Each structure stands twice: as C-alpha cells, then as structure tokens.
C-alpha cells in the first residue's frame, strides 16, 4: 500500500517522551488515502520509542467519518500498547467534525501541538 509513494506522515521528537506525527494531506476523504494514512501512522508509531504521540492535523482541511474512525482505531492501537494519543491543530471543518463526534470525551483534542505535548508530557 506504500509502494512508490511518499509517506503521508512525518515524525519528530518533542520534549523527550512525546513524538509528534504530522499529517501531510489536506483532504482526508478518499478511502484509499485514509487506508494509506492509517498504514503510515501505524508504521511511524511502531518505529518510534515514545509512549505518547501527538497527531498534528493543522494541515488537514477536510475529513470524513471514515477518517475519524481511523483516528479512533489508532487511539485504540496505542492504548493496547499502554501509550497515549492527543490530536492537535484541528480547525474549521475538522474541528466541527471532532466536536460533533464528541471526540474530546475519548482523547485530548488540543488547539495547538504545544498544548497537546504539555498534556501528554510525563511529570
């Protein structure tokens, strides 16, 4: 599913134990793209040694309920490993979808990456 295409996710370590995964897609509405993004996120998570991850969605303008379901599956994948996830940078349509789905009841949804890192950072 990844043959010949660049990854939709880049990773950087932030304040030690928190890894920030940045999504490089502005329109997460096509089934193929959602599937590829899910694969790329799992690969980045499995390759990392962090116990907390921030998903930076600041570049995402549109997403579907299928994409929302994929993010929830990523959250469950991390929880099974004893890891935590926060979403950051959602604005406009994406923020509305998260609010309507009451996603903040399941995991932290923060306006900025910095706030998400602060929430997940070990004391």
State where each predicted segment sits.
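Intrinsically disordered or compositionally simple regulatory linkers and C-terminal tails
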Residues: 1-5, 123
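Short secondary-structure boundary/capping segments
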Residues: 2, 10-12, 77, 99
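STAS-typified acidic loop motif
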Residues: 4-39
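Short acidic-hydrophobic, aromatic-tinged amphipathic segments that line or gate anion-handling sites
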Residues: 108-116
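Generic C-terminal helix-cap and adjacent flexible tail
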Residues: 115-123
């Amino acid at each position: 599913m990844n043959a010949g295409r660049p990854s939709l996710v880049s990773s950087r370590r932030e304040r030690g134990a928190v890894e920030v995964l940045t999504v490089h897609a502005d329109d997460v509405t096509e089934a193929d793209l959602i599937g590829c993004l899910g694969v790329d996120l799992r690969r980045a998570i499995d390759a990392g040694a962090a116990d907390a991850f921030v998903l930076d969605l600041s570049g995402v303008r549109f997403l579907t309920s299928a994409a929302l379901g994929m993010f929830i599956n990523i959250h469950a994948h991390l929880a099974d490993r004893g890891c935590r996830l926060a979403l950051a940078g959602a604005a406009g349509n994406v923020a509305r979808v998260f609010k309507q789905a009451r996603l903040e009841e399941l995991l932290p949804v923060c306006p900025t990456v910095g706030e998400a890192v602060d929430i997940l950072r070990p004391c």
